[in-house]
């Protein structure tokens, strides 16, 4: 258990300090030019008859209140971990949310009245929230009383394999998209939501009074990843839903709800439990040798509270996302879009984000910029997107915050990017209704002649 907790903690801080991120708003504005946008808006219709992708499509999102230089400080020509500095800048509540996505495979086929797609994605999410009580302990040890009830952490990695169908109605004014997904859990760790732990230390005699309730760490997976990534025993079901409506030639509206689903964790499950305790008193010790403080603490806790391990299966939600946008077609090639994004994370509260973007839409390429705000870090961000076609090859990229490119890495606490390559065949610039209208007009002209 010790090794597992230490590894998870290290991963927690590495991911905090690595990248800068937002919530796919720039990528969303690539619209129907890129087939992967169906991952966040299943109602988007591809422009090409056949769309094929490989694992060369990936992206990441990170949002944190902690920066790299809050943890690592210069020490001559080297860097060192400075927990005192981390403790000095820590807020009452500190936050992290990250996501990595790899599109393993995707095949999209445009039909007469919509599209059908087949896909597989690998996703990993790490979310955490911790108080400055934890940073105080990390920096100075157990020298005073503390209470822990806001600490939360959830780490999930899973594969999704599915099929998506989009259908148009009312002369292509209305479109509805639905994607059904089989979920296969790869690895998971979560602290029970209602876990509470408090320790009252009397500085005069070092008596400890300890209380704990519902302190359980549920874990699963982490081994035989190749087998679990396809059809493992940690199974679940997910769904994406989207709807769009074209009010007139100028205005249209899109709504999508993604990642509605959960995973049942039944394979390689271990529950690490700290038994409930109420006002348990222990004659504490003063830690004089900081090198052995971890072992001393562990031994002391064993004398106070019993710990045990179990193998009970459990269920976890994957975290739903909501996107709503309003599109204004200023002219044939100039589009403005206002977007609202909300993430219902199963472990922490994440504030919604808002974006206002512009895209120049050409026949086979598009490029644009977007200004956004919101999220737990707030502030103003400026991003951009691009999709170009070179023969049957498509290259695309999107980023929500330019400062993640030119800013100092050690001062970063937020980032979002999407990159990929697709193979496209059978371009169709006009809708089916446009084609039918042209045929009718041609027949009328022929009869008139």
Regions picked out by a protein language model, each given a short descriptive name:
Residues 1-8:
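Bacterial N-terminal signal peptides that target proteins for export
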Residues 8-15:
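Bacterial N-terminal signal peptides
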Residues 16-21:
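Sec/Tat signal peptide C-region and signal peptidase I cleavage site
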Residues 22-449:
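Subset of outer-membrane beta-barrel
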